[in-house]
């Protein structure tokens, strides 16, 4: 979704975007020309978990508003961004959940969970597949995010528990993973603050930031994207009983029950949660309204600061490349002649699906007392995707400290 002019120049803008996200070898003058011409690419996906129904219902309304609204703010979004929307990440599961819900509306089972998985091969864990990319839906998303478009910004819309805040926005809570560029974590604060402000402006209560969901977690798309230099985030909307509203009494609203660094020990006002929702009826329309505001606010912020976002994208790519060039370890050598060559080929393919550059040696290489044959794979850290390479191929240890 974009302006008619941008859509007419889509192939050129995609090529410009590819150079912005990987500016190696470009002069400063060339980079500045690309930034002047480029558009911010924003991707948002909905209802990866099929039982989290509201985002897919919101998607059609979001698209309609963007293509019909004549307000200046919407025009700025269309002129300055290219919006890639995945309205339903798991359409088969969405149909299953819808059919189950409709079958039992008006019975004692209305709004209950299905007694089988809404994804045949992985259930709820499709949100853990952004690094292995075993599922066809994950492969499709990886093609968009890591090879064909490489957006500057990604947001994934989810649902969470019923008896707490109404909406979570980034930044994530502590701790953070070590391999993202520091600008990523600043940008998450930047986007999250703007979305939270716009929600408060719209009179929507119960929005929390910097809590509950940590910055070191499984490698779903909204986490692994950060190590690709894509500012990647999620929203989490309070759940209802699928499409059936529920009534939440004030005494049912609670924090996480402990003074942890998840940053919500109690359900009462605090700096990242200044306007608690008091309770009452809660249903899909409430969920859609806040997701619409958050989605549009993200797009508007990217459009408003188009050049800054693109400059940051260049800076993140160059910084990560430079860090890789200066590290003690230049990269990873992977022998092709191991006892299980098919698994080697699978590993290399997984890395290629991430858009990682991989080279092969022309001759034998002797290193550290080991001789590697010609044709050995070399995954250099001297590239913009250094963060994701280190996240996938190095050992990392969750901090054994206050976090």
Predicted regions and their residues:
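Hydrophobic positions within alpha-helical membrane elements
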Residues: 52, 95, 161-163, 241
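Short, conserved secondary-structure transition motifs
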Residues: 78-97, 382
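Aromatic- and acidic-residue-enriched carbohydrate-binding clefts of CAZyme catalytic domains
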Residues: 107-125, 267-271
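Short, solvent-exposed turn/loop segments enriched in Gly/Ser/Thr/Pro and often Arg
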Residues: 86-90, 101, 156-164
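Aromatic- and acidic-residue-enriched segments that line the glycan-binding/catalytic groove
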Residues: 97-109
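Proline-aspartate-enriched helix->loop->beta-strand connector
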Residues: 145-160
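Intrinsic-disorder/low-complexity accessory segments
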Residues: 1-53, 60-82, 128-129, 134-136, ...
């Amino acid at each position: 979704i974009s302006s008619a002019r941008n859509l007419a120049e889509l192939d050129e803008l995609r090529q410009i975007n590819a150079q912005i996200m990987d500016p190696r070898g470009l002069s400063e003058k060339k980079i500045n020309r690309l930034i002047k011409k480029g558009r911010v690419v924003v991707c948002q996906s909905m209802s990866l978990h099929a039982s989290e129904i509201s985002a897919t219902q919101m998607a059609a309304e979001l698209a309609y508003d963007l293509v019909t609204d004549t307000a200046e703010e919407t025009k700025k979004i269309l002129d300055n961004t290219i919006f890639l929307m995945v309205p339903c990440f798991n359409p088969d599961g969405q149909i299953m959940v819808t059919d189950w819900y409709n079958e039992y509306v008006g019975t004692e089972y209305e709004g209950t969970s299905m007694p089988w998985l809404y994804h045949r091969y992985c259930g709820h864990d499709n949100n853990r597949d952004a690094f292995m990319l075993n599922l066809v839906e994950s492969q499709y998303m990886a093609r968009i995010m890591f090879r064909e478009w490489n957006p500057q910004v990604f947001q994934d819309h989810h649902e969470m528990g019923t008896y707490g805040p109404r909406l979570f926005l980034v930044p994530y809570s502590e701790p953070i993973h070590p391999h993202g560029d520091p600008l990523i974590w600043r940008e998450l604060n930047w986007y999250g603050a703007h979305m939270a402000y716009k929600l408060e402006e719209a009179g929507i209560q119960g929005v929390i930031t910097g809590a509950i969901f940590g910055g070191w977690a499984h490698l779903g798309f909204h986490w692994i994207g950060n190590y690709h230099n894509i500012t990647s985030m999620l929203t989490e909307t309070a759940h209802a009983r699928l499409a059936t509203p529920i009534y939440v009494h004030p005494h049912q609203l609670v924090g996480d029950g402990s003074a942890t660094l998840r940053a919500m020990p109690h359900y009462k006002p605090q700096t990242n949660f200044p306007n608690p929702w008091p309770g009452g009826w809660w249903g899909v329309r409430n969920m859609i309204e806040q997701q619409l505001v958050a989605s549009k606010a993200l797009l508007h912020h990217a459009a408003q600061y188009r050049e800054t976002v693109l400059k940051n994208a260049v800076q993140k790519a160059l910084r990560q490349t430079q860090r890789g060039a200066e590290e003690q370890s230049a990269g990873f050598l992977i022998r092709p002649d191991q006892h299980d060559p098919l698994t080697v080929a699978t590993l290399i393919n997984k890395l290629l699906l991430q858009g990682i550059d991989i080279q092969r040696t022309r001759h034998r290489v002797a290193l550290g007392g080991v001789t590697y044959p010609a044709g050995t794979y070399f995954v250099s850290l001297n590239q913009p995707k250094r963060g994701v390479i280190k996240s996938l191929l190095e050992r990392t240890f969750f901090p054994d400290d206050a976090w």
